[in-house]
Amino acid sequence: MLRSFLCRSQNASRNLAVTRISKKKTQTTHSLTSLSRFSYLESSGNASVRNIRFFSTSPPTEENPVSLPADEIPISSAAELTLEESVASALGFSESGDYGGTSVEAVGEDGDSEIVAIENEVYQFDDEKLESVLSLLRSDEESLEFGLNALNVDLHLDFVVRVFESPGISGKNLIRFLKWATQNEEITVTTSLVESLLVAIASDTRRMDAYGLWDLVKEIGEKESCGVLNLEILNELIALFGKLGKSKAAFDVFSKTEEFGFTPNAKTYYLTLEALCKRSFMDWACSVCEKMLKSGVLSEGEQMGNIITWFCKEGKAEEAYSVYELAKTKEKSLPPRFVATLITALCKNDGTITFAQEMLGDLSGEARRRGIKPFSDVIHSLCRMRNVKDAKALLLDMISKGPAPGNAVFNLVVHACSKTGDLDEAKEVLKLMESRGLKPDVYTYTVIISGYAKGGMMDEAQEILAEAKKKHKKLSPVTYHALIRGYCKIEEYDEALKLLNEMDRFGVQPNADEYNKLIQSFCLKALDWEKAEVLFEEMKQKGLHLNAISQGLIRAVKEMESEAKVTEDGNLLAEA
């Protein structure tokens, strides 16, 4: 678009002008036929009134004028036509309508006209003055206007355009030059000048120049029916402020669009939202989005996806979903990756998970086969909400229609079933997983074991542990930790101690937590400080540290038992 601005500005500078040269032509008289011919050429648009001027005098009075109807006007003879062509050729006219840069204004009365004088104006640049102006504009001269006045330039619109096309001039100086030039009544601000100015400032990306241009545009726009601005200029100004990171200025331009008599289009909304969202001005962005939705104007494909992504990143998933709904209404296609992004954003909030579920139905074909992430996100959210029923239903739908669920998706459902205490359902999902050729990992078994251990169902937990030992040579510390806590909860400390001793055989090194849990259980519940002290010695040998609280418990239980024994011995002696 900026290239088209520049081309239009270059086309405007084809007629070069500064020095005027006047020439006088010989006085000539033409017939009605010749006059009508000039008039036709003038009306065809090839003639320009400002270059050649014809001045007519009163024709000689005929003694017996004959008035003929229009349809009976005699046609000139061949000789007359030949004479006319030679005269036209002498004046620089040709049959093709090429006047050599001149134009005609013909005036005639009663079918006869005398051409008294022809003034041919040819405009040429004074290259020295042009270079002087450019040199001044490329400098940092503070008194720029004074310097321009001193050059005594014969201003013309083409001269101004030529200055704007010249490289190396700052946007600030171009604006100052334009304001100085428009003090001349013959120079007015045109669309091409504003476009050229926008091109120059956009290439430099200087913040203050951009603000200066906006002030000029506002001044132009506030003049009613000026016809200089257009929507594309405002759009590019919004883009410029967005590039500079000046979101407030971009929003100001957007707010003035309708005031200047233009209706925002899809590009206007897109550029404004881009400028606002990238700087997290989300309140303004939401108001622009709301206006866009009401207008029904929406970008295509990638741009629409970008708008959705910007809102999702800023936590505005509902606004993004509104854009998606409008796109569906207008049957606009959205690239699948943007659909997945929106589904993921909707899954973060329990209140919008329903929208995410509905959007899964919009994925089809290749997009659905590759859509494991959005499906997994929805199942994860349903499990977080403990909506196991819908989570399992979606899992079965994935098995039936795709995308094929992996271990991670099955684990989500198993975990949700275990947390809700529905361990039988968890085992069913585990069997379903195995039936599809998937090997449950240690985490899957651990989740079910933990569920059984929390419920005190240690026999069932041991069954799952035995199954896990068959499938995996190395288990997880979390697996044993859950079992040890389960046995301690039902006060079967010897079973817990057995598990601690077998951990090494399955590639698991007991950590301080397991020892600490058992030591505290032996001290507080079993009051067996001797076993607690044995475990403490094992920890020392393995280089593990027992916290001070547990060490204090061992000493306290040991002292308490000693005091109890002394008291008991004293009582026995007293009885004796």
Swiss-Prot record:
**Per the UniProt entry, what species is this protein from, by scientific name?**
Arabidopsis thaliana (Mouse-ear cress)
Q: Where is the transit peptide?
A: 1-76
Alphabetic keyword roster:
Mitochondrion, Repeat, Ribonucleoprotein, Ribosomal protein, Transit peptide
PPR repeat start-end pairs = 230-264, 265-299, 300-336, 341-370, 371-405, 406-440, 441-475, 476-510, 511-546
Q: Which family does it belong to?
A: Belongs to the PPR family. P subfamily.
Source superkingdom: Eukaryota
In terms of PROSITE patterns, this protein maps to: PPR
Q: Give the location in the cell.
A: Mitochondrion
Q: How does it assemble?
A: Component of the mitochondrial ribosome small subunit.
Q: What is this protein called?
A: Small ribosomal subunit protein mS80 (rPPR6)
